[in-house]
């Protein structure tokens, strides 16, 4: 249960949401070129240490995370990440995922 609410899991969920949003914008809306999506899928990642370092400057955890992901993905593909989303979209969805992960543990323990 502790791992679900750990900072690293939260950011891993953020990353999954961002990549899934890009995949949807490519597949459904045709807004992201295939070559950029391939780069995003291959290179998207984050470093906890780097996110903390950026957050000291920005005072915003989501912006720090997005800057770190952009560093890894590269300028052109990075312009697609988080486009059309808000910080609340990311935070609220992540909270729902963490609650679901926690509920699965609780239900399993009850059974």
Place the predicted regions along the sequence by residue.
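A helix-coil-helix interface module used to build multimeric assemblies
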Residues: 1-111
